[in-house]
Amino acid sequence: MAQGRSPLLQLPVEGYTKTEKDEIRLTFQIEAKDANGVLLQAPATGKVEANLSPEDKDWLPKLRATVLIPPLIPPGEYQLLVKVADELAKASVDAHSTFHVQGREIEPSRTLIVRNFRFLRTEDDTKPLPVAAYRPGDAVWARFDMTGYKLGDGNQFDIEYGLVVLRSDGTQAYAEPQAATQKEQTFYPVRYQPGVLSLNLAKDQKRGEYTIVLKVRDNLGSQTYEAREKFSVE
């Protein structure tokens, strides 16, 4: 499975009890957890009630539920626990399974840090530029990941970032103190946040080396982090 997907589960059930009128009554709960037992979402619950006819002799009830795979969870093995109760027989059964999640893995940190800063040619590029060189009139794109921020009650996070662009002599060419704010409360703890920035170079932009000073602030953890990355205009 991939990060951010919501697969629909359809699980057949056997061995249930029927009444004299061929009625069945099942309830179920489905939990998805990480390797540490942390729930990915609130447990999915439901019930199956049906009146069977002679034509349904080969029919099996199915448990249907959607499992949300959060978009920024680490790749790896995850657990699925299904609990089914037969209300007529006053019996229950548990079933366990595992599933693998694919996606990007960001090295964790105990303190605020920026990882994987990469310059791009366009907004949608997935491969970083081997040499961060642009021409006057180009758009400078960059992406990065922020991790190590503190989580508050209910897995809330509150981070923001701004930037300054310095010329080769250290003077300021551009500044955007608050380029973006990322504040959210999630069911599953989100340990990193992707960031993006862009600059539009003037057609008469002076050639030379420039430095982006990226300043990240963790408002809940009272932390700051500064990253410096160079690019050139040729």
Residue ranges and their predicted role:
Residues 1-234:
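Intrinsically disordered, low-complexity terminal regions enriched in Ser/Thr/Pro/Gly
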